[in-house]
């Protein structure tokens, strides 16, 4: 607990809100171009080959974004839409690629949770 004298010398600093997705610069999504598409392994105790892409955004910032869903068609120079949202077991991956927009096609044969993977309703 500071004394009154200490508060006069240096006032209390307000807690500034630190953004979890600074590369988006306050926008809900940003467009970018894939510079590299590759796989990385997650932290312990998980084990897999997670698909990620290095993306250069229109703002000029280069980020690492996760490619959700099973299978993808992304390659170098693909145009993608990126949203915020980290992947808990991949350090440094704080963004997700939005499936079903621009060059990222939706997940094939997806029945449930379709809106998250860019899949239109399948008519019988």
From Swiss-Prot:
Entry's transmembrane regions: none
UniProt keywords (A-Z) are: Plastid, Ribonucleoprotein, Ribosomal protein, RNA-binding, rRNA-binding
Instruction: From the Swiss-Prot or TrEMBL record, state where the protein is found.
Output: Plastid
Q: What is its main location?
A: plastid
A single cellular component GO annotation: plastid
Q: List the disulfide bonds.
A: none
List the InterPro entries hit by this protein, alphabetically.
Answer: NA-bd_OB-fold (IPR012340), Ribosomal_uS12 (IPR006032), Ribosomal_uS12_bac (IPR005679)
Q: Which Gene3D superfamilies match?
A: Nucleic acid-binding proteins (2.40.50.140)
**Which Gene Ontology MF annotations are present?**
rRNA binding; structural constituent of ribosome
* One example of a Gene Ontology biological process annotation: translation
Task: Tell me which PROSITE patterns the record gives.
Answer: RIBOSOMAL_S12
Oligomeric form and interacting partners: Part of the 30S ribosomal subunit.
Family to which the UniProt record says this protein belongs = Belongs to the universal ribosomal protein uS12 family.
Q: What PANTHER family does the entry give? A: 30S RIBOSOMAL PROTEIN S12 FAMILY MEMBER
This chain belongs to the protein called: Small ribosomal subunit protein uS12cz/uS12cy
